[in-house]
Amino acid sequence: MSTPTQSLQVKLLDPRFGDLWPLPAHATESSAGMDLRAALEAPMTLQPGDAALIPSGIAIHLADPQLCAVILPRSGLGHRHGIVLGNGTGLIDADYQGPLLISTWNRGREAFTIEPGDRIAQLVILPIVRAGLQVVDTFVDSARGAGGFGHTGVR
């Protein structure tokens, strides 16, 4: 388990944390994310194409306007079972204090059952840059220019 470099306020909204489930934590020194669990009362089966908002059982308060949190999918669930986030990425602003809900979508071909306590997403804390927009008529040339999708090729 890694050593935290910053404190994060968390409210436990589900009494199973601490007893049955550990708090979200970085699994290794190099882990960027902390796993979020499905704080369900009973197993939930998502049929192909189904989406659901699944409670994580926690609320966080970043408090620092220079930070945000993102909820990201777990790679194995998406690759092996087609279980991904319904909104792509969940963005948590520094002043949000409500429960973290995980928008979960079964894009796979088979039904998938999520059990209470399953690790279904991950939470990553990120610094943000608050940029002001500067309107210009032209940009300074870059090597890429306006080349868009597929412009740099695959090899």
Curated annotation (Swiss-Prot):
It is an enzyme of class 3 (hydrolase). Its EC number is 3.6.1.23. It catalyses: dUTP + H2O = dUMP + diphosphate + H(+). Keywords: Hydrolase, Magnesium, Metal-binding, Nucleotide metabolism. It comes from the Bacteria. This enzyme is involved in nucleotide metabolism: it produces dUMP, the immediate precursor of thymidine nucleotides and it decreases the intracellular concentration of dUTP so that uracil cannot be incorporated into DNA. NCBIfam families: dut (TIGR00576), PRK00601.1 (NF001862). Belongs to the dUTPase family. This is Deoxyuridine 5'-triphosphate nucleotidohydrolase. It comes from Xanthomonas oryzae pv. oryzae (strain KACC10331 / KXO85). The gene is dut.
